[in-house]
Amino acid sequence: MVAVTLAGCGTTTYFAGRNLPPSGLVNRVMIAIQNPSAFSYGALEVVDAYYDTRFAYNNINQTFPVSGFSGDLPVTIQNMAEEQTGAVYNSGSGSLAMISYAKEAATGTQNGLNGDSSSIFITRDQEYIFAASQEEHVLTIVDRAKGGSYALSLPGIYRVSVNPGGTVALAFVQNSNYVYYPRQLTSSETLSYSGGPSTWPTSAVDCEPQNAPKWCLFQVADSNGTPLTFDRPLKAVFSTDGGTAYILNCGPECGGTASSASLLPTGPMIFRLGLASGALPSQSSMTNIPIPGGASNALVSSSTMYVVGQQPQTDGLYTGNLTVVNLANNTAGSPIGISDGSPGAPSRMILADDNTLWVAMTKCNNGERYAKGLPYGCLTMFNTSTNTVTLIEPYQGDATGIADVEGLHKIYAVEGGQVYIFSTKDGTAYDNQYVTVTGTAYDVAYIDAHSDSNNTVY
């Protein structure tokens, strides 16, 4: 990237008019680190992803910590590069810290969350936060624009998904076959539903506050109020036009029957005030794409959806698969073997240079590959032009983060609590000695990405 100084105002900018940050770096990867010292439980460090160093290229004593960050065991970075903002969830304190990429500084911690969150997202306009508060059995909604926080009861909730446009949120309950969505209420609905549960719509499972509700949580149901049945659903990804939600049915790897992807229109589930429209399908008319290789995570790219999951074997172990789905005709290809992983557990997926897709799994040493003496690393490099696996990287521990360093033909990855660098041309490992961290690395994000799609927390 080329930095440009604007004449007369002393401001230096680079890509898309972004101001040059205090570090002066234009290819930055931010690393979430747990227990970086005996006196700290968390830190965020910026490294130069062009030179692959944690210090300035001309001064080894100049490093780039994110100032003001005091998180406790950071585990995820929701990367919003277009907004020059990151949201870092800290599992030790149950807090969500907001990070300014332009200032390379923490800008505050979000209040109003209910205990720890097993899954949490903020909309890109930073107006709403949705969190699965599993221990408290509530879906927490923080309305940052209006200053309210709402706890909608949903026993067993453990995952939430939010669409890129920030208009639809879906909630999932562990070991359940149902899906839920929140919706903000109009003033007339608030009045109509203020008499308690007997005045709520048939598919509403909670409305809060009950004496004058502002939000209701609805079960996904047809126009007659009959709940739609899924198969251990745990996540949703969305079409590029935003009109369709692909519900991932985890199936056997989550204790269910058959893995698949179910298609729902997003219009009826829009949570923003007065924008919901249309109706959800009936059970018989809902499109369902069988994905026998497993379906616990997915990534949509134009008219293709890449789905990964774990498939049970006769010996009781699981093997990892990637399935390519053609969204133009809703057909799935044959499963392609990739890294094994923990059944139903979160995984990471990202597209990178040279037509590559990278998949990060955890507990890959407990799967079928390890048991049979096959390559069993947790990080898979997949070629999207040939739909083949290029390689499975050697085992270095759980893979918990990936970042695409756009245009430089490499990715950063976190494996076994340390940072590694791999070529997108052939998967070769680059020298990582100057980006390794003290403590336990847990996630990485390329914060100078061109778009918000360079993100594995979605």
Where would I find each of the regions flagged by the language model?
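Sec-dependent bacterial lipoprotein signal peptides
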Residues: M1-C9
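Predominantly soluble domains enriched in secretory-pathway, periplasmic, or organellar proteins
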Residues: C9-Y458
